[in-house]
């Protein structure tokens, strides 16, 4: 089962402790061969929202929130439980939230 894993960070919390352990998480997912892709994303100040077939385009932050999507990973796991276990070990889970969404596959 493939899952899109959103890494949501809270800018009000310090994240320096997580920097060292991300490499450990990446090594573990490589060892288990479950991570297919992943990248950090730029912050909400660089975001663009497009609606109504391109007629409405908005740049910049959109919501008065301190939590935003800071990155994503694509996981390919045997079960949902395995995906949850792997996501729960991501170091940024301590500084925000990890959201898992299964791919729509038949």
State what each model feature region is.
Residues 1-106:
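Conserved, structured core segments of small domains
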